[in-house]
């Protein structure tokens, strides 16, 4: 019984772009994969990290990982958009075999419980 392959795309954004713009890029690439007929399995912000060597005079970068499955056509669309973007300094897509990755909960991405939201509204 063979499992359907999936793809993992890791890309590095320039470290000097604002947080709002980082979110815009993440959303744009997720939507691009979905529009190409693939399913987004997982999307992780790995944060700002030091690079092993300077890339385009940058010593740090904002790492983002995007896991998706589909027929492979979405990879060309995604990589072309990343190649043309000035904010993406490096990207790599790897075809994975085996079980699909389980969705991970990234700290800070969990919604607040309703009781905490109501308490914050009362205090304000």
From Swiss-Prot:
| Region span, Disordered | 99-124
Q: Which UniProt keywords apply?
A: Ribonucleoprotein, Ribosomal protein, RNA-binding, rRNA-binding
Which PROSITE patterns does the entry mention?
RIBOSOMAL_S6
A single Gene Ontology molecular function, please?
Answer: small ribosomal subunit rRNA binding
Q: Which residues cross the membrane?
A: none
Biased segments, Low complexity type: 114-124
GO annotation terms (biological process): translation
Under the heading SUPFAM superfamilies, the entry gives: Ribosomal protein S6
Taxonomically, which superkingdom? Bacteria
Listed Pfam families: Ribosomal_S6 (PF01250)
Family named by the database record: Belongs to the bacterial ribosomal protein bS6 family.
Query: Any idea what job this protein has?
Result: Binds together with bS18 to 16S ribosomal RNA.
Q: What is this protein called?
A: Small ribosomal subunit protein bS6
Species whose genome carries this gene: Prochlorococcus marinus (strain MIT 9303)
Source species taxonomy:
Bacteria, Bacillati, Cyanobacteriota, Cyanophyceae, Synechococcales
Q: Which gene encodes it?
A: rpsF
């Amino acid at each position: 019984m063979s499992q359907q392959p999936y793809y993992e795309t890791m890309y590095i954004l320039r470290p000097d772009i604002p947080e709002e713009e980082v979110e815009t890029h993440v959303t744009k690439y997720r939507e691009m994969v979905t529009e190409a007929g693939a399913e987004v399995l997982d999307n992780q912000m790995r944060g700002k990290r030091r690079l092993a060597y300077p890339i385009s005079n940058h010593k740090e970068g904002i790492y983002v990982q995007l896991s998706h499955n589909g027929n492979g056509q979405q990879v060309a669309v995604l990589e072309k958009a990343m190649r043309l973007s000035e904010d993406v300094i490096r990207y790599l897509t790897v075809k994975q075999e085996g079980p699909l990755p389980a969705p991970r909960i990234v700290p800070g991405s969990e919604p607040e419980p309703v009781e905490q939201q109501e308490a914050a509204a009362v205090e304000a």
